[in-house]
Amino acid sequence: MEFWSSAMSRNLGSGYEAIKSPWADYAIYSLPDASRIEACDRQPLMDAMNGIIAVNWQAAEPHWTATSSPFDQKYSLILVYDGSGLVAFSVYRILQMSAGLGIYRSGTEVLPAHQGRGLYGFFTAEVLKCSGAAERADGNVLYGWRTRNPIVWAANAKICEKVSPSLLDDAQDPALQAACVEMCTSLYPGKPLELPDMIMRGAYGHIKHHRQAYRGTASLVDAAMSRKIPNSADALFSVGYARV
């Protein structure tokens, strides 16, 4: 996978303004409209993003490509750099659902050496802030993600009042199940969900998640995932009511 990372950007460039960073050694850029990335910066940045994915996953081919680009106007981006280059990123979308505002976490990756520093939680807070979710008086925000990573599932479920599918109990929420189907149909036309477990078959045919030792809630989630989606190409599509 070296050819994906050889052109990694070492910074985003002076044409972009960094936001306030909680870490002295990270420069962070938050772009609600990913199409603001200039054409000349797109390939190096995409190579860097694919390079991180190739570290965290067994990847047969690049995940982000010119035909499946993270720089479409429909996406928003958060990028984290240190002195060596891009170390983490998050791609997300803001959706108008029939039940109101929707947020979808399209993909978040952090290099192993930078995991455990709170970047995932920072990304989540920034996504909620930029989406306008924090200003909603009713607090009714649908928050969706697709994964087979137990840590990611547990981290996202933690910020939700309820989640479908509910991996840790047998609770069923018809409204959330309907939201899962609506969001999935909007994002991935032609990719059906298997109800009630919200399984998306073949979601990760080109990449395979690196398994690891899990602790706490993540270990319980891992056990549930191992039962429901033993095939490494399958994923769970989840939607919850975000606490804002």
Predicted feature locations:
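A conserved beta-strand-loop-helix scaffold within acyl/acetyltransferase catalytic domains
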Residues: 30-112
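Hydrophobic, well-ordered beta-alpha structural blocks that scaffold small-molecule cofactor pockets
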Residues: 74, 78-80, 89-92, 121-122, ...
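A short linear-motif detector with a strong N-terminal bias
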Residues: 5-9, 56-59, 82-87, 121-125, ...
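Polar/charged side chains located within well-ordered beta-strands of beta-rich proteins
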Residues: 90, 105, 124-127, 238
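Terminal substrate-recognition subdomain of acyl/acetyltransferases
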Residues: 2-40, 132-244
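Short, surface-exposed linear patches
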Residues: 51, 102, 125-131, 164-169
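Short, solvent-exposed secondary-structure capping/transition elements
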Residues: 100-102, 116-119, 136-137
